[in-house]
UniProtKB/Swiss-Prot annotation:
Optimum pH is 8.2-8.5. InterPro entries: COMT-like, O_MeTrfase_dom, SAM-dependent_MTases_sf, WH-like_DNA-bd_sf, WH_DNA-bd_sf. This is Chlorophenol O-methyltransferase. Belongs to the class I-like SAM-binding methyltransferase superfamily. Cation-independent O-methyltransferase family. GO terms for biological process: methylation; secondary metabolite biosynthetic process. One of its GO terms (molecular function) is chlorophenol O-methyltransferase activity. Residues 8-21, 31-41 have a biased composition (Polar residues). Chlorophenol O-methyltransferase that methylates chlorophenols into chloroanisoles which are thought to be responsible for cork taint of wines. The only single chlorophenol (CP) methylated is 2-CP; neither 3-CP nor 4-CP are effective substrates. Within the dichlorophenols (DCPs), 2,4-DCP supports the highest rate of O-methylation, and the activity decreases in the following order: 2,3-DCP, 2,5-DCP, 2,6-DCP, and 3,4-DCP. Residues 1-41 are annotated as: Disordered. Keywords: Methyltransferase, S-adenosyl-L-methionine, Transferase. The gene is cmt1. S-adenosyl-L-homocysteine acts as a competitive inhibitor. Also strongly inhibited by low concentrations of several metal ions, such as Cu(2+), Hg(2+), Zn(2+), and Ag(+), and to a lesser extent by p-chloromercuribenzoic acid, but it is not significantly affected by several thiols or other thiol reagents. S-adenosyl-L-methionine binds at residue 320.
Length: 467
């Protein structure tokens, strides 16, 4: 797909291709996947992993030290995040993490690994209680607080507060410097200070967590798992056959606001910046002719604003549901040359596309919310508006074949696939599944392929209308 460009300092990877970068990542993945590389004994494998951890930690430490960057630790004043790192140092982080995870499983043993994996929901439970009661904000940043004093500030009984805190401490969230005194670690401190992170924990523990617990029942009752009103979320909140998750959240202002903040927190994590798309997707031909870019389900137009800063002659139309459009900031940008080229329009993408003859129709974080029949319907609703050569661009996850994904990202992508199923009976897709969506929508869609910019977790999937 020629339209996705990468500067010389960034490489792009086509899903399933065999570029040198892909080969290197596959080798790295191969090295750290359990069972993929067997050594003579469990002992020798442990030594290989231990040496990897030592060597790569030395590299990371040396880079941070030589560049005057604070060393990470668990103390209350530790850095919130890693700064952007050179590729080879980021790779050291990945190797440390992956080797540590494998070594943990080896020394724990297979039976214990499985036995305790199923208890991971308890990590969510303790965080749910701490976040819901605002415990992190009640602990002073600069000194410990007596547990009995902390309890007096909450409606929780002492045993329940202590239980939640001491469980979270096993995940390095809070610490007990002396018996009966609670103090912050870096993780509990940032939970106290970051409202978007609080929203992320709240949404996942109070909305998604119950949904996950009801997936089994949903699958037993509806094994086809297609309808967005028969997902685990619907069973958890008694809306089976009535409405999808987004409608339920939309009726509750507090939950809707929390969801929006949670998505803001997630989308600002490593590998999600909109700049990956803005800086690398080529709109020069569209800009040259003063063309139109339609941002479908574009919320308050943050993608279009960034694109309009780069491309000076294009026009942008941001479409979303009426309540979302009504709540958008006015003006949409302080830069008049940007704001004047962006218009907002109420539209439900399950209805026929009203903007005819645009050059690009764009979906970011939209298609993955929908099972195949709904996703196909969304694409078909574009057809009456499409002119020959119009591009349909999807900015979403695209999962590589099992075992070929960078292992650093594999868990994240698989987690996202699971949660989309739990919330909406939706899914993350591989390249062939995106191709199938376009083919099912109309054979006049010509699938151009998938590309992903180095270090970005999201892909660009593109088709062109060829009537």
């Amino acid at each position: 797909m020629a339209e996705l460009r990468a500067p010389s300092s960034l490489s792009t990877e086509r899903n399933g291709s065999a570029s040198n970068t892909d080969v290197d990542k596959q080798k790295l993945n191969h090295l750290y996947q359990n069972g993929n590389k067997k050594t003579g004994s469990a002992e020798s494998r442990m030594l290989v992993l231990a040496e990897t951890i030592r060597a790569e930690t030395q590299k990371l430490h040396a880079y941070l030290e030589s560049n005057g960057i604070a060393q990470p630790d668990l103390s209350v004043d530790a850095p919130d995040d890693f700064p952007p790192l050179p590729d080879e140092i980021q790779e050291s982080r990945q190797k440390i993490f992956l080797a540590s995870r494998e070594l943990t499983d080896i020394v724990r043993g297979p039976r214990e690994t499985v036995r305790y994996a199923v208890w991971s929901y308890l990590d969510t439970l303790s965080l749910q209680l701490i976040n819901s009661y605002g415990i992190a904000k009640l602990v002073p940043l600069d000194a410990p607080i007596k547990l009995t004093e902390l309890q007096s500030k909450t409606p929780l009984e002492p045993v329940h507060l202590a239980r939640a805190l001491r469980h979270a401490m096993t995940n390095n969230i809070f610490r007990e410097p002396s018996p009966g005194y609670i103090a912050h670690t870096s993780s509990s401190r940032i939970l106290a200070q970051d409202p978007a992170l609080q929203a992320w924990v709240g949404f996942n523990s109070e909305d998604a967590f119950p949904a996950a617990g009801h997936v089994l029942q949903a699958l037993k009752d509806h094994p086809e798992a297609i309808s967005s009103t028969h997902a685990g979320f619907n069973y958890a909140f008694n809306t089976v056959g009535q409405e999808p998750m987004f409608a339920t959240l939309g009726k509750d202002l507090a939950r809707a606001k929390r969801f929006a903040q949670a998505m803001h927190s997630f989308s600002h994590g490593e590998g999600y910046k909109v700049s990956y798309f803005v800086d690398n997707y080529d709109l020069s031909e569209v800009d040259k002719r003063g063309g139109t870019f339609v941002d479908i389900g574009g919320s308050h137009g943050f993608v279009s604003v960034e694109l309009a800063k780069r491309w000076k002659d294009m026009k942008f139309i941001v479409e979303d549901l009426p309540k979302t459009i009504e709540s958008a900031p006015q003006p949409i940008s302080d830069d008049k040359t940007v704001a004047d080229r962006i218009s907002l329009q109420a539209h439900d993408f399950f209805q026929e596309q009203p903007v005819k003859g645009a050059d690009v129709y764009f979906f970011r974080w939209i298609i993955h919310n929908h099972a195949k029949p709904y996703a196909v319907s969304i694409l078909r609703n574009l057809i009456p508006a499409l002119k020959p050569g119009a591009r349909v661009v999807i900015n979403d996850y695209c999962i590589r074949e099992a075992g070929s994904e960078n292992a650093w990202d594999e868990k994240l992508l698989r987690n996202m696939d699971m949660i989309m199923g739990a919330l909406l009976n939706a899914q993350e897709r591989e390249e062939w599944e995106f191709r199938e969506l376009f083919e099912a929508a109309d054979p006049r869609f010509k699938f151009k392929g998938v590309q992903r910019v180095e270090n970005c977790k999201m892909s660009v999937i593109e088709a062109v209308w060829d009537e």
